[in-house]
């Protein structure tokens, strides 16, 4: 499919992304969809197609591949890393979004390294945040930038939790500091607490 050929996100995680996208619509959660780490746009297109045509989608990527991992990312990441790894293009993203019938006007590409683009991003409320950023510093910056903007009942999804040491460490530290570590579902996503218990009827990863 157009989605699978333009992403390295697993099938089970794509199904969960779709379910969460539908959930923010049915629950009327306010805000944009934001994805940090876009590659060729497969998961971004899925999120855009699964949400309302009125909901704006912001996609953050350098389109130069992953940055070099740091000390907190562990030996495996540093030994496997190659320059240009996971590099897509803005054209790839536009093409797959169009194939899924998503209007260009909904999709906003924010090109550049996170440390350059995220601090300057306007404080839009966020309904769903998908972090596919692999390394400790990148994931930590995404969380510190966007967490306060996520609406109550909104979803934060971590693609690389449990796969890469740096991502796992960044997520554990961030959530634990806020008493949210036990709300991490299947090591994959967390729903920002609201007044009611937002853990009811949440989709499970296979």
Give residue spans per PLM region.
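S-adenosylmethionine/decaboxylated-SAM
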Residues: 1-11, 22, 27-205
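Short internal alpha-helix immediately C-terminal to a glycine-rich phosphate-binding loop
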Residues: 19
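N-terminal pre-P-loop "Q-motif" helix
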Residues: 13-16
């Amino acid at each position: 499919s157009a989605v699978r050929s333009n992403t390295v996100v697993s099938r089970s995680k794509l199904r969960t992304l779709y379910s969460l996208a539908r959930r923010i619509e049915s629950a009327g959660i306010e805000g944009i969809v934001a994805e940090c780490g876009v590659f060729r746009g497969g998961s971004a297109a899925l999120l855009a197609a699964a949400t309302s045509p009125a909901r704006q989608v912001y996609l953050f990527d350098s389109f130069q591949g992953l940055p070099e991992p740091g000390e907190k990312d562990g030996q495996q990441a540093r030994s496997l890393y190659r320059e240009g790894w996971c590099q897509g293009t803005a054209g790839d993203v536009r093409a797959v979004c169009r194939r899924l019938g998503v209007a260009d006007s909904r999709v906003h590409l924010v090109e550049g390294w996170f440390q350059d683009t995220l601090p300057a991003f306007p404080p839009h409320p966020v309904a769903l945040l998908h972090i596919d950023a692999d390394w400790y510093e990148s994931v930590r910056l995404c969380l510190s930038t966007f967490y306060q903007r996520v609406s109550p009942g909104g979803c934060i999804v971590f693609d690389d939790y449990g796969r890469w040491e740096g991502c796992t460490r960044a997520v554990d530290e961030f959530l634990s500091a806020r008493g949210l570590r036990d709300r991490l579902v299947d090591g994959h996503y967390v729903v920002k607490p609201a007044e009611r218990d937002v853990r009811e009827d949440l989709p499970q990863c296979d």
